[in-house]
Amino acid sequence: MYQPTGFANTIFAQRYAINAEETFEEACQRVANHIAVAENGSREKWAERFTEVMVNNKFIPGGRIWYGSGRMKGQLLNCFVVPTEDSREGWGKTVSDMLIISGTGGGVGINFSPLRPRGTPIRGTGGEA
């Protein structure tokens, strides 16, 4: 079984362990249990498989996955692209989604492609974009 030493252990303990007592093997089990939910079939079987390859250093997930797995507000991805609809409600939902994602550590990009061009008439208000 792989056990991080020296600088690798320092980084693991400071950034990825849930607390000072969590060992590398326990962290592997935590991450494996979290990501096994996405697999078809027995969650326990997949968690065992993931744990085995991780503790033997055959597969090491990205840092965000280590950090976010098993935490209440953890993100497993660094970046998100948020769609937006061309309406007041759509803009509000986009801002709300952006705040939630940013608040849990994710980066946000917004797709403005669906928005109408400047000068386009707005139905119901008589205004223009």
PLM ranges: what are they?
Residues 1-129:
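Extended catalytic cores of very large enzyme megasubunits
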